[in-house]
């Protein structure tokens, strides 16, 4: 039977970024919720996102990737009036993105889905008072991995596509990734023991081994990559710190912008104090710099 500490780590990995930013119960002013907007379809099922607009939106938007262990769960968008209060209070439009979820879908599917979500948001940006050049992305754990994939592999749209969504770019302006896996090479056949110890993490990794490099953001950093902030605990055993230190080194070999914040004593998740004193301030300083109006 798994130990309580192992179960806690599993929960943090599978829950992703849910508790990453401290917040209290109500935004300063009522926010408008546009729920269950369909950004695509897969196997006859809808891919959905929620857009939450603060009363005094500043034009920038943050896509919150609802992903932990590459599982993407639905919850009432009203919950993000609580979890996302800090974003709304700073006048960011908050976009909750769900991708095709494990166990049915695997990592490459999730990557493709979040790319499409960015394209959709760009397509519909004017409808929601969003500047498409001021899109940030935030995610923890698997959501952090997907954030870095978006930051490093953004592409222009295909003007000739019959799918109007695909005519728009998948580029973002900035990303914030908490404890992200950055190098998935070897994860399909020989994942680290800490991953093998969590049975729920097996299904999302059951994909063609040849695709591992394509979903390893560390291999896709270029001068054109979006600014990336990584926040990682030095006691993380599930996704060790080297994932972010190696990513930082890859960024430093280019003219791309990156920063790594190491949280001393933190494992795969942060205490309320670490969230309030480190994660929140670093996140909003990053978005404040790279999502500001030009």
Task: Report the location of each language-model feature.
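Mobile cap/lid helix-loop segments that gate and shape the active-site cleft of serine hydrolases
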Residues: 29-31, 36, 41, 151-153, ...
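Short amphipathic alpha-helix adjacent to the substrate-entry channel of hydrolases
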Residues: 76-95
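Primarily recognizes the serine-hydrolase "nucleophile elbow" in alpha/beta-hydrolase
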Residues: 116-189
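Catalytic active-site module of serine/aspartate enzymes centered on a nucleophile-bearing elbow/loop
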Residues: 276-294
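Catalytic histidine-centered segment of alpha/beta-hydrolase-like enzymes
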Residues: 266-276
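Conserved alpha/beta-hydrolase "acid-adjacent" motif
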Residues: 237-243
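Short beta-strand element of the alpha/beta-hydrolase
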Residues: 59-68
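Short beta-strand/loop motif that positions the catalytic acidic residue
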Residues: 230-232, 236
């Amino acid at each position: 039977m798994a130990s309580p500490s192992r179960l806690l780590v599993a929960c943090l990995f599978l829950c992703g970024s849910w508790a990453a930013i401290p917040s209290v119960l109500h935004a300063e002013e009522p926010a408008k919720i546009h729920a269950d907007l369909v950004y695509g379809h897969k196997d006859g099922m809808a891919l959905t996102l929620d857009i939450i607009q603060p009363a005094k939106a500043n034009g920038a938007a943050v896509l919150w990737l609802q992903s932990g262990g590459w599982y993407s769960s639905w919850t009432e968008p009203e919950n993000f009036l609580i979890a996302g209060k800090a974003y709304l209070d700073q006048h960011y439009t908050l976009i909750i993105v769900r991708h095709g979820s494990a166990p049915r879908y695997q990592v490459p599917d999730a990557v493709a889905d979040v790319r499409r979500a960015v394209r959709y948001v760009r397509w519909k940006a004017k409808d929601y008072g969003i500047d498409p050049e001021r899109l940030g992305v935030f995610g923890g754990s698997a959501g952090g991995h997907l954030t870095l994939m978006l930051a490093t592999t953004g592409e222009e749209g295909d003007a000739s596509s019959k799918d109007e969504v695909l005519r728009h770019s998948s580029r973002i302006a900035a990303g914030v990734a908490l404890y992200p896996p950055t190098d998935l090479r070897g994860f399909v056949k020989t994942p680290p023991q800490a991953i093998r110890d969590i049975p729920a993490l097996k299904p999302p990794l059951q994909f063609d081994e040849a695709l591992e490099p394509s979903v390893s953001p560390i291999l896709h950093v270029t001068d054109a990559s979006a600014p990336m902030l990584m926040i990682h605990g030095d006691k993380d055993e599930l996704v060790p710190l080297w994932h972010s230190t190696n990513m930082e080194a890859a960024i430093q070999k280019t003219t791309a912008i990156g920063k790594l914040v190491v949280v001393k004593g933190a494992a795969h998740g942060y205490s309320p104090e670490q969230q309030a004193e480190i994660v929140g301030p670093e996140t909003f300083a990053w978005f404040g710099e790279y999502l500001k109006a030009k």
